[in-house]
């Protein structure tokens, strides 16, 4: 293409994404837009087409972002090129959202006509506003009997401050209002700015590993043009590669000769090493590089840590490969090797939240067929010692001796919880039970309230979300952001079996709830550990102090079975002999903790 053709094409490009709270109908709307623009034949169409991972379809949530190119003939008779970038809605995956928004100029904000605005809707809108996107509100599910589009329209104006007078009333399921949405995209979303003659700048917003083609980078071209055969350089790592193919997704990968300004597509350059393409990096030409890289995304810091161990220790290397490949398109995952006496070799991994951790575990078990054991999730604590030093602890087994600790600080989050009036009491109770501090309460309208609390992250990590959902019949929605560290009375609790510490069961807990938590764990282990030939004490300790104890009784053979009547001293002798043997066994015996016992303790509720 020459310069004029490129400029004409650029003026017809519209890059947009769809943002919404979980379950407000985002993936269904994406399906309808694909149908309307004839991206697929009827035969290829299936529900939630862009959710390509099995896990996404099973759970009905979007985890990874997806990009797709559509051609649309608008009412003004012109052909437009639309790039739809699908995003997840769950709080753990906001970084996926911020990545896809950085590649767009506009966003469709989908709000459920029955439920109205939820916490995640707000969080994603603010991300979109930070990226200066044009936001088009769409009120979805208007065919529901409980829909109240006018109330929701008012809510969008009051709560978010967007003009919703032209908001499209739609039903993605019934296919109502889809054309209107497409027309608004064409009219209101600006065409990409940028110059195809400038030095090349492409933003990598995702990447995949293909065993035949190496690493495939998903890119958005901001300036310049990239063709097959070009030598390109990654600006963060300085590595250079020759481009082997470029193309776009029309859901299927379709090869092209070149990608130019505003295009969203993929680039392969037989990149073998996973570490050479960082998400958020800028690609430029090796011969005529751009002066500076694009503003990437900030590196996300993991909030939750846990140990992952292969059940079969021979698969340790497979687990490392699996983590490396997943890290490639999951930039928020971090991991480093660690060992445990109870579980052998494994990795300490950092995640954004519990859902992220669960999804990752499942992906490893499914995609790489590795069975895993996970240790209890923990957060990063700051420990200040009496000698004036301080250290960072993300693993309970690294906690120093209680005598040397001056104070411990833990991360706190500011949680905004949106909830119907009827459940305010229940939510406040949960937050107080989780050591939350009440900050603020605001009424959104007559029926809904936003509660703001400061809560320790370690309490949220555990089962906060489940409790919130189950106590509000699923109506509460919640979003949180880190606000920093504050001192807390925290202690490390160890579990001893037969007076030997089991490192994988140690955890850090608040002093006030230590006794209850210890008691529950000890009882749980008593049920799950099989009886031995000798009696096994299970103790929960803080430092040298035992706070809870329970005993697994020994199995014993009836040694008196062969005595009929007769003298007590004969029986005594046999019983003493048995006792002696049990004592000897106890001093040398070790207790195996079965897999189920680990799992049960880690999944344990506080209640």
UniProtKB/Swiss-Prot annotation:
Molecular function per GO: GTP binding; GTPase activity; ribosome binding; translation elongation factor activity
Main location: membrane
Keywords assigned by UniProt, alphabetized: Cell membrane, GTP-binding, Hydrolase, Membrane, Nucleotide-binding, Protein biosynthesis
Subcellular location: Cell membrane
Cited Pfam families: EFG_C, GTP_EFTU, GTP_EFTU_D2, LepA_C
GO CC annotation terms, alphabetical: plasma membrane
One GO term (biological process): positive regulation of translation
Domain tr-type G: 11-193
Taxonomic superkingdom: Bacteria
Protein's UniProt keywords contain NADP: no
Name this protein carries in UniProt: Elongation factor 4
Organism, scientific name: Bacillus anthracis
């Amino acid at each position: 293409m020459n310069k004029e053709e490129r400029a004409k094409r650029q003026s017809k490009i519209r890059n947009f994404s769809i943002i919404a709270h979980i379950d407000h109908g985002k993936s269904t709307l994406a399906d309808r837009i694909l149908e309307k623009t004839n991206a697929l034949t009827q035969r290829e169409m299936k529900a939630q087409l862009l959710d390509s991972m099995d896990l996404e379809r099973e759970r009905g949530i979007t985890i990874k972002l997806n990009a797709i190119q559509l051609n649309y003939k608008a009412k003004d008779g012109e052909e437009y090129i639309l790039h739809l970038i699908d995003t997840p809605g769950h709080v753990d995956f906001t970084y996926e959202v911020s990545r896809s928004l950085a590649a767009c100029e506009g966003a469709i904000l989908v709000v459920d006509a029955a439920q109205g605005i939820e916490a995640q809707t707000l969080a994603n809108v603010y991300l979109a506003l930070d990226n200066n996107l044009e936001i088009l509100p769409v009120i979805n599910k208007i065919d529901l009997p409980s829909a109240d589009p006018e109330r929701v329209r008012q809510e969008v104006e009051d709560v978010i401050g967007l003009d919703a007078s032209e908001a499209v009333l739609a039903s993605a399921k019934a296919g109502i209002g889809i054309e209107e949405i497409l027309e608004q995209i064409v009219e209101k979303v600006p065409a990409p700015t940028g110059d195809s003659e400038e030095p090349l700048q492409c933003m990598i917003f995702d990447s995949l590993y293909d065993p035949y083609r190496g690493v495939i980078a998903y890119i958005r071209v901001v300036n310049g043009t990239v063709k097959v055969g070009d030598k390109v350089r990654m600006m963060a790592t300085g590595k250079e590669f020759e481009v082997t193919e470029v193309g776009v997704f029309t859901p299927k990968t379709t090869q092209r000769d070149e990608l130019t300004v505003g295009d969203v597509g993929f680039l392969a350059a037989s990149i073998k090493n996973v570490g050479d393409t960082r998400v958020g990096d800028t690609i430029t030409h090796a011969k005529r590089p751009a002066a500076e890289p694009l503003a990437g995304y900030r590196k996300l810091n993991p909030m939750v840590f846990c140990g992952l161990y292969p059940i079969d220790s021979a698969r340790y290397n497979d687990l490392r490969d699996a983590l490396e490949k997943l890290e490639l398109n999951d930039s928020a995952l971090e991991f480093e090797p660690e060992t445990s006496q109870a579980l052998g070799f494994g990795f300490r991994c950092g995640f954004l939240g519990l859902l992220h951790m669960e999804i990752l575990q499942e992906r490893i078990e499914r995609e790489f067929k590795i069975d895993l054991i996970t240790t209890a999730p923990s957060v990063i604590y700051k420990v200040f010692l009496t000698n004036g030093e301080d250290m960072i602890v993300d693993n309970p087994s690294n906690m120093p001796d209680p005598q040397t600790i001056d104070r411990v600080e833990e991360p706190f989050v500011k949680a905004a919880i949106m909830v119907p009036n009827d459940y305010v009491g229940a939510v406040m109770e949960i937050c107080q039970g989780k050591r939350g501090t009440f900050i603020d309460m605001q009424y959104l309208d007559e029926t809904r309230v936003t509660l703001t609390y400061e809560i320790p992250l370690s309490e949220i990590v555990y089962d906060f979300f489940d409790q919130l959902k189950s106590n509000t019949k699923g109506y509460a929605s919640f979003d949180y952001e880190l606000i920093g560290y504050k001192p807390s009375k925290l202690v490390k609790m160890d579990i001893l079996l037969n007076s030997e510490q089991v490192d994988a069961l140690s955890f850090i807990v608040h002093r006030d709830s230590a006794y209850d938590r210890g008691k529950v764990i000890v009882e749980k282990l008593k049920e799950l550990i099989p009886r031995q030939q000798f009696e096994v004490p299970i103790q929960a300790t803080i430092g040298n102090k035992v706070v809870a104890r329970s005993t697994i009784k020994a199995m014993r053979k009836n040694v008196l079975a062969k005595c009929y009547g007769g003298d007590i001293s004969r029986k005594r002798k046999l019983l003493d002999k048995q006792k002696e043997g049990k004592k000897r066994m106890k001093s040398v015996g070790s207790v195996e903790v079965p897999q189920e016992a680990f799992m049960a303790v880690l999944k344990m509720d506080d209640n």
